[in-house]
């Protein structure tokens, strides 16, 4: 004879009583794997409160972090890529563009805006890694070029936030042209004596590193960012040697003289405002 008898076979909850967490309410830190509430992430500028890992975010979040009261005027919002080469890999390039636009809500891998940081005017161009790996195509180059022209015309400092896997292979030479195009525009910005600040975030690689990302009057990076040209695996296979510990991290690049500062995202707005005030005076 059983000591206990279960009167009810199981516990059931009516559908009306069930409560589900809304999508996007919780995130997991890629570094320490701890759960992060979206409200805490927003308050902490998308930096893990446990291990200080800087989560990858896009232009929407950077504009939110940097611009006063999240107020800004978006510049050149309707530029979209063509397909002059009729490129097809696993799928047609035009189809890939349409899918990326639907998935991200973006027109391409960059957005540009004019706003204020602690009262100081600033033009910001920010790349989005979620759009085809933040790859640099003709629209990315054109938006940067037009943003620089806008900065020169209105005499406003320019901030470039890079986050990219490099040149967009689907546009071939049209993509590579953007390296020279943006570098030439930055030379005009320098001639006009207008400050250019380059912020390198995780990851900044390929043709972006080899052009505008490293040409700032001040080059800044976020902690732990991957910064380089070719990837570490490709380099290791080429030179047949083990790479130094921490190779291609922001800290390694700073130590070897290619960066001026590493700045925590939570202090970024104040640091940028200080630079702007210093350069204006």
From Swiss-Prot:
A Pfam family annotated for this UniProt entry: Zn_ribbon_ACC
Pathway: Lipid metabolism; malonyl-CoA biosynthesis; malonyl-CoA from acetyl-CoA: step 1/1
Binding site for Zn(2+): 29, 32, 48, 51
Cofactor or coenzyme needed: Zn(2+)
Disordered, as annotated region: 1-23
Chain ranges of the CoA carboxyltransferase N-terminal domain: 25-281
PANTHER family given in the database record: ACETYL-COENZYME A CARBOXYLASE CARBOXYL TRANSFERASE SUBUNIT BETA, CHLOROPLASTIC (PTHR42995:SF5)
Record protein name field: Acetyl-coenzyme A carboxylase carboxyl transferase subunit beta
Organism expressing this protein natively: Pedobacter heparinus (strain ATCC 13125 / DSM 2366 / CIP 104194 / JCM 7457 / NBRC 12017 / NCIMB 9290 / NRRL B-14731 / HIM 762-3)
